Amino acid sequence: MPLIPEEPLLASSPDRFCMFPIQYPQIWEMYKKALASFWTAEEVDLSSDTRHWETLTPGERHFITHVLAFFAASDGIVLENLAGRFMKEVQVAEARAFYGFQIAIENIHSEMYSLLLESYIKDSDEKSRLFRAVETNPCVEKKAKWALRWIDGSETFAERLVAFACVEGIFFSGSFCAIFWLKKRGLMPGLTFSNELISRDEGLHCDFACLLYSLLRTKLTEERVKGIVADAVEIEREFVCDALPCALVGMNGDLMSKYIEFVADRLLDALGYDKLYNAQNPFDWMELISLQGKTNFFEKRVGEYQKASVMSSLNGNGATHEFKLDEDF
């Protein structure tokens, strides 16, 4: 049986303790993009949302609360995978820097979703049930179980990398889309603005997974990757079209199903494989957040939440500009 070559990204190295010299400029640039997009939950104004909440239909409220319940739990699952496995496995300092910052951002997402639920739900029993949705809600539990099985499983790093790209790229897609639909209708400004920031972050995290995958020497077979992606698509479709139908917020389930397939095709393309569904984007207004890689959505700097000084420090090769104190003023 031929030996499988060791992956440079995973090969133990004392260099992992020092940030410089940068080994992978493209990873360093991703890290800097993540830094430039830092935001906090305190920067999201929820003052108008309570008034809007009272005008929503019971179906709309049900949809929003259960989407938020899934989001609140899923960020914790992503965190557990990053801290428990990926951070220990990846040995490249700049990749570990990205994961370290992603952990901080996922904590902010988790705080944001929890704040939204706190703000909207006044009944303490219902609030408790939603915060424990992984145990109390079958449709949330199914998605969570699929993600959790990859944390403790014996699958290769490549398989788990693809699976968590699906968690962040596909499992959030239908819900992100539905919340953007609310924005299109002029509803819930705090929720929809936080959704813009979070969907941008998750798009970058998904891009990072695709970048790391491209740097692996041993790739998965097309059949294996498409199997993982198709699994995720079916679970997301069931979640947002059946168990928690997007019709509750006035969206067409068939179009939503097509949108999920479209997002999955984009992910497959980013991973270097052929499309599975050949689906078109049925929601032209979602072009900006189709999680397509280095998106124009990211470059638009949603709400100007990109720290210009961080990005200007990059000069194309991962190095930083020289800082001088002897300039003439």
Curated annotation (Swiss-Prot):
Annotated compartments: Cytoplasm
InterPro entries named among the record's database cross-references: Ferritin-like_SF (IPR009078), RNR-like (IPR012348), RNR_small (IPR033909), RNR_small_AS (IPR030475), RNR_small_fam (IPR000358)
Domain of life: Eukaryota
GO MF term (any one): ribonucleoside-diphosphate reductase activity, thioredoxin disulfide as acceptor
Statement: the UniProt record of this protein carries the keyword Iron: yes
Cofactor: Fe cation
Gene Ontology terms describing biological process: deoxyribonucleotide biosynthetic process
Organism of this sequence: Nicotiana tabacum (Common tobacco)
Protein name in the entry: Ribonucleoside-diphosphate reductase small chain
CDD domains in alphabetical order: RNRR2
Chain residues that bind Fe cation 1: D75, E106, H109
Cofactor binding annotation: Binds 2 iron ions per subunit.
